[in-house]
Amino acid sequence: DFRDNTFDLVYSWGVIHHSPNTPEAVSEIFRILKPGGQAKIMIYHKWSIVGFMLWFRYGLLALNPRLSLADVYSQQLESPGTKAYSITEAHALFDDFSDVRITTLLTHADLLTSRAGQRHEGFLLTLARKIWPRRFLKFAFSRAGLFMLIDARKG
């Protein structure tokens, strides 16, 4: 346990969306930051290309189109219970902070430019890697990246 108002900076890259209680983790970050301290956090973005790809494969093609994105992320992306948030939901998570800035970032996973997602290997992923419209996605869906970067200050 850290005392209140201890740190000038808290940095977390892809961690708190795996915790059982993400809002509690954000509250703890707020508590341990000094006034004026900065939080730099990355959590997963719900409305990402990765989320759509996983829903397409494990929802639509599995004849389960009602499968929620929450279930897709929880069951198919990394570890069980993984969560992803909309920008609105992220703002609500960081409501106690002042000067909250949120941006999304297209990743190698959104653009299928790496071997990430090996557990999903198969014909569909192999084909998608060959025909994936990367330039179009970068242009038309630049805000649909998996990574949501949050820069927040404790007022």
Which positions does each model-derived feature cover?
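Short conserved AdoMet
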Residues: 20, 34, 95
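A short SAM/SAH-binding and catalytic strip from SAM-dependent methyltransferases
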Residues: 8-21
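A short acidic, Gly/Pro-enriched loop at the edge of an enzyme's catalytic core
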Residues: 1-9
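Conserved class I S-adenosyl-L-methionine
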Residues: 38-67
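A short glycine-rich, Lys/Arg-flanked "PGG" loop and its adjoining helix->strand segment in the class I
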Residues: 23-38
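Short catalytic/ligand-binding loop motif for oxyanion handling, primarily in non-cytosolic enzymes
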Residues: 1, 47-52, 109-114
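A C-terminal cap/extension of S-adenosyl-L-methionine-dependent methyltransferases
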Residues: 57-61, 67-72, 78-83, 87-92, ...
